[in-house]
C-alpha cells in the first residue's frame, strides 16, 4: 500500500489514489478539503529528496507553471517544499496522454493532427512570451481531455529564457525521440527547441 493514499498533506489535501508514475515523482488524485476541489498532487519520491539537481528541477517546475495562465497549460494551485515532503498541487486532468491516444487510435488524420498541434503551439507561445522554454515536449507530456482539448504538462526541465542561464550544460536534457539537435549536444536551447519537438 502506498504511504500517501488515505493521508492528508498539511491537513488540506486528502490523497485518494495513485494516477501516474514519472521519472522523479508520483502523481496522485486528491481532494482539497478546504473547498472540495479534485486536484492532482505531484509528490517528489523519497529517494530523490536529497538529490539537489532533481529537487531543483522539481522546484523549477512549480515556478515555471505558476507564472503561466493558459487554457492549454495545466494550472498550479499550491506548492510545498520541506524536509518531510515536497509536492506540487495542480489542476486534475481527467483524460489520457496524447501518447496513449495515438497508441489506441493509430495514425491520426490530418485534421486531428492540426487541431492538436494548434493547441500545443498556443500553449508554447504563452510559455515563450513569459520567458519559459519547456524543453521536453512529447506525447507523454500532453494530456487529452474528453472534450478534445489538450493541456501541456510536466515543466520539470523547463528553463527560464531570461534568467541568464545561457551556458552550456554539457549534457542532453529531454526525451531522445523529440529533442532538437542542440539539446542532444547539450548546447544552450531557446524556444526553437520546443518548436522542433512539436
Model region roles, listed by residue range:
Residues 83-97, 101:
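Conserved short submotifs of the Hanks-type protein kinase catalytic core
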Residues 45-67:
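AlphaC helix of the eukaryotic protein kinase fold
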Residues 31-38:
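Conserved N-lobe loop of protein kinases adjacent to the ATP-binding glycine-rich P-loop
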Residues 116-117:
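Activation segment signature within eukaryotic-like protein kinase domains
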Residues 79:
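Activation-segment/catalytic-loop signature of the eukaryotic protein kinase fold
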Residues 15-22, 27:
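Protein kinase glycine-rich loop
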Residues 120-132:
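Protein kinase catalytic-loop region centered on the HRD/HxD motif
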Amino acid at each position: 500500500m502506498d504511504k500517501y493514499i488515505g493521508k492528508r498533506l498539511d491537513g488540506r489535501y486528502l490523497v485518494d489514489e495513485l494516477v501516474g508514475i514519472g521519472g522523479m515523482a508520483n502523481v496522485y488524485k486528491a481532494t482539497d478539503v478546504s473547498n472540495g476541489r479534485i486536484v492532482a498532487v505531484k509528490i517528489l519520491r523519497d529517494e530523490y529528496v536529497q538529490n539537489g539537481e532533481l529537487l531543483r528541477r522539481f522546484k523549477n517546475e512549480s515556478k515555471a507553471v505558476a507564472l503561466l495562465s493558459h487554457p492549454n497549460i495545466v494550472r498550479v494551485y499550491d506548492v510545498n517544499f520541506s524536509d518531510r515532503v515536497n509536492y506540487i498541487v495542480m489542476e486534475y486532468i481527467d483524460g489520457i496522454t496524447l501518447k496513449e491516444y495515438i497508441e489506441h487510435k493509430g495514425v491520426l488524420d490530418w485534421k486531428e493532427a492540426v487541431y492538436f498541434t494548434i493547441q500545443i503551439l498556443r500553449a508554447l507561445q504563452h510559455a515563450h512570451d513569459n520567458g519559459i522554454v519547456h524543453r521536453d515536449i512529447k506525447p507523454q507530456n500532453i494530456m487529452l481531455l474528453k472534450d478534445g482539448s489538450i493541456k501541456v504538462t510536466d515543466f520539470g526541465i523547463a528553463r527560464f529564457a531570461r534568467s541568464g542561464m545561457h551556458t552550456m550544460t554539457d549534457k542532453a536534457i529531454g526525451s531522445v525521440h523529440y529533442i532538437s539537435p542542440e539539446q542532444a549536444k547539450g548546447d544552450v536551447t531557446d524556444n526553437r527547441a520546443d518548436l522542433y519537438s512539436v
